[in-house]
Amino acid sequence: MYAIVRGGGRQHRVAVGDVIEINAAAKGATATVGATVELPAVLVVDGPSVTTGATALADITVTGEVVGHAKGPKIRILKYKNKTGYRRRVGHRQPLALVKVTHIGPRAAADRKTAPKRASAKAAADQTTAAQATAE
């Protein structure tokens, strides 16, 4: 079983036990070592069955544990203007979070999000008039 998950602005193919590097500026990835993060699934493959679509994936969760932090490769930025002697060199290393995938599967019943039931417009109007009548 494996899943394609979104993390840090990229998509990663993960299986249980894999360690992935995600952008530490992403939501949840700045957590301390040992914290649990949930990665949104884009696609889940379990043998011959492939699960896609937002409604089908709403019941599936991919959780991981932050096992460490690292820095990405050095990127050198150079600004140069001709004939003026202006040169400026700057470097950058992106902070990364190392996340070990611990679970791919159905979401626990307590974690499922249920949409609140909406009252019809007529029922809402009746409640408003009843409240006004009792207030008078």
Swiss-Prot record:
One of its GO terms (molecular function) is structural constituent of ribosome. Residues 121-136 have a biased composition (Low complexity). Residues 107-136 are annotated as: Disordered. The keyword Cytoplasm does not apply. GO terms for biological process: translation. GO terms for cellular component: cytoplasm; ribonucleoprotein complex; ribosome. The keyword Glycoprotein does not apply. Keywords: Ribonucleoprotein, Ribosomal protein, RNA-binding, rRNA-binding. It comes from the Bacteria. Pfam families: Ribosomal_L21p. NCBIfam families: L21. Part of the 50S ribosomal subunit. Contacts protein L20. This protein binds to 23S rRNA in the presence of protein L20. Belongs to the bacterial ribosomal protein bL21 family. This is Large ribosomal subunit protein bL21.
